[in-house]
Curated annotation (Swiss-Prot):
The chain crosses the membrane at residues 99-119, 167-187, 217-237, 262-282. It is found in: Plastid, Chloroplast thylakoid membrane. SUPFAM superfamilies: TPR-like (SSF48452). It comes from Arabidopsis thaliana (Mouse-ear cress). Its main location: plastid. GO terms for biological process: mitochondrial cytochrome c oxidase assembly. It is a multi-pass membrane protein. Belongs to the OXA1/ALB3/YidC (TC 2.A.9.2) family. Keywords: Chloroplast, Membrane, Plastid, Repeat, Thylakoid, TPR repeat, Transit peptide, Transmembrane, Transmembrane helix. One of its GO terms (cellular component) is chloroplast thylakoid membrane. This is ALBINO3-like protein 2, chloroplastic. The gene is ALB3L2. The keyword Repeat applies.
């Protein structure tokens, strides 16, 4: 008991001395800028007289801790503190106001990440050029084993032709997102902690960077955040790309774009709950993103950086306007040129049509093809491409007319070179597909059997077209009740791509069932 009393007396005397020291030497304002941590450490249960070293370390050299003796802690992570120190040093070095420090630091970070973005875009350009030469990564009728085999075959073929790794879709995003949130967290900490100079570091309506948006100009930042987000979505998901993407992928893209557009509404309200210092950073980052996207999409910039696809000219492929019989485009010197469509050859018109069709503009593509065929009605490549364009628009009857005409011309000339054989294969495949879609299975089978009689091509892309035609032929034969013939064709397809083995098994099982029924009827009679 005597020991405990002496400890308590010592603690009480120290309490009075420390209180006297703080009342004379420390102003109340010195505690305002140091807000307590959200989760304070629990006080030690041991008496203070048993921990003199702890008190010495916790008090610090200049500001001894008072009666509560709580160790000052900072719940911020080391990266956040490092960014805060860097921004403070940049501010002291330049003497610029804080809003300019935040904005310029944002621009500097985005410029530092730009080389990585350009490298990623170049890799993705190479992937997009090689992807049409590769087989599908997932079979049309996926099963676990079939999907694994098909994907392994896809990876093997991609390595064989030198296709970059598909991990190149992620590097920029995996670096940019952490940088965005790190800067956001650092500036938010400075705003909430009342960092020196933040109370007068703004300009115009946002003088105090630590305050939340308010007053008559309060909606400005939230509106800018929501608007810039919406604009970024429209630039990223351009309408022609979404229109061109069909099937499940196109549907998912459309719904994902809609989801991101709807996010603009909650982002507007989120803007009211963020300090104005953080809002300066967010708005600057969004505006830089808009400028960066528009710049990289510009044909001249794309050509300088080597981001344009091979064979695509900046003017004709990316910045082009067609009105009546005139085409306006930007040439390699970034000068706007006007050209009459009547002066172009059928080959040039077809090249333009292919580029327009790749953007999803089927109407303009068909318009150019009609003009090319007016100049040369026997232009076989133009006839085949016209049939394909009309087939995409589901104008099946007109598509078959052009494809039949192309096939007859090719057969009359007895195609021997590789280009004519490929045209015959494509025209026959698309004509067969058009007839099958119209329910004219017999007419479709005639054209598809013509493809089956051709020699298997060596080019990977042509080979995929060849086996797609065989698969379509087996489907038509199966629907016509010729399951034996369908199974023969499917065996050839499965030898090329094992992912279609379940279809073959289904076809063979039905053949066995039919044979069993026939034998039973013979036994009955």
């Amino acid at each position: 008991m005597a020991v405990w009393r002496s400890c308590l007396r010592a603690s009480s005397s120290r309490h009075r001395l420390s209180s006297l020291f703080f009342s004379h030497h420390l102003k109340p304002s010195s505690f305002i800028s140091h807000s307590p941590p959200l989760f304070s450490p629990s006080p030690s249960p041991s008496p203070t007289c048993f921990s003199p070293l702890h008190r010495l370390l916790s008090s610090g050299p200049e500001f001894p801790i008072g009666s509560q003796e709580i160790i000052p802690t900072d719940d911020s992570s080391l990266p956040v503190l490092a960014v805060v120190d860097f921004l403070e040093g940049f501010h002291e070095f330049t003497g610029l106001p804080w809003w300019m420090i935040i904005a310029s630091s944002t621009v500097a970070v985005r410029l530092a990440l730009l080389p990585l973005l350009i490298l990623q875009l170049k890799k993705l350009k190479t992937i997009s050029e090689l992807l049409p030469k590769l087989p599908m990564p997932i079979p049309e009728t996926p099963t676990l084993k079939g999907s694994i085999d098909q994907f392994s075959h896809f990876l093997k073929e991609s390595r064989a032709i030198g296709c970059p790794s598909f991990l190149w879709f992620f590097p920029y995003l995996s670096v940019q997102l952490p940088c965005f949130f790190l800067l956001m967290a650092s500036i938010r900490k400075m705003s909430l902690d009342g960092h020196p100079g933040f109370d007068s570091g703004g300009v115009l309506w946002f003088q105090n960077l630590s305050d939340l948006p308010g007053g008559s100009f309060g909606p400005v930042f939230p509106i800018l955040i929501a608007t810039f987000h919406y604009i970024n979505i429209q630039i990223s998901f351009d309408t022609s790309t979404i229109r061109q993407t069909t099937g499940l992928t196109g549907l998912l893209m459309r719904y994902y774009k809609l989801y991101l557009e709807i996010l603009s509404v909650p982002l507007f309200f989120v803007g009211y709950a963020i300090p104005q210092g953080s809002l300066v950073y967010w708005v600057t980052n969004s505006s830089v993103n808009i400028f960066q996207q528009l710049s990289l999409k510009h044909p001249t910039v794309g050509a300088k950086l080597g981001l344009l696809s091979q064979g695509a000219t900046p003017g004709m492929g990316h910045s082009m306007e067609i009105s009546e019989s005139v085409i306006k485009y930007v040439d390699s010197d970034s000068k706007e040129q006007t050209l009459s469509l009547q002066t172009l050859t059928p080959e040039e018109l077809l090249s333009l049509s292919v580029q327009v069709l790749s953007k999803g503009d089927k109407e303009t593509s068909i318009q150019l093809l009609r003009l090319a065929l007016e100049k040369d009605p026997g232009y076989v490549r133009g006839l085949v491409l016209m049939g394909q364009a009309l087939l995409q628009k589901t104008q099946l009857s007109e598509a078959t007319e052009y494809l039949e005409l192309a096939i007859s011309k090719l057969l009359d000339e007895d195609p021997s070179d590789a280009e004519d054989v490929e045209l015959l294969m494509l025209a026959s495949q698309w004509a067969g597909a058009a007839y099958v879609q119209q329910g004219k299975l017999k007419s479709g089978i005639i054209h598809l059997e013509r493809v089956a009689k051709l020699r298997e091509p060596g080019d990977p892309k042509s080979k995929e077209h060849y086996f797609e035609a065989l698969l379509l032929l087996s489907s038509a034969l199966y629907k016509e009740g010729q399951s034996d013939e369908a199974a023969k064709i499917l065996r050839v397809v499965v030898d090329h791509n094992p992912a279609y083995k379940p279809l073959l098994e289904q076809c063979e099982d039905e053949n066995e069932l039919v044979s069993d029924l026939v034998s039973r009827r013979k036994d009955h009679f």
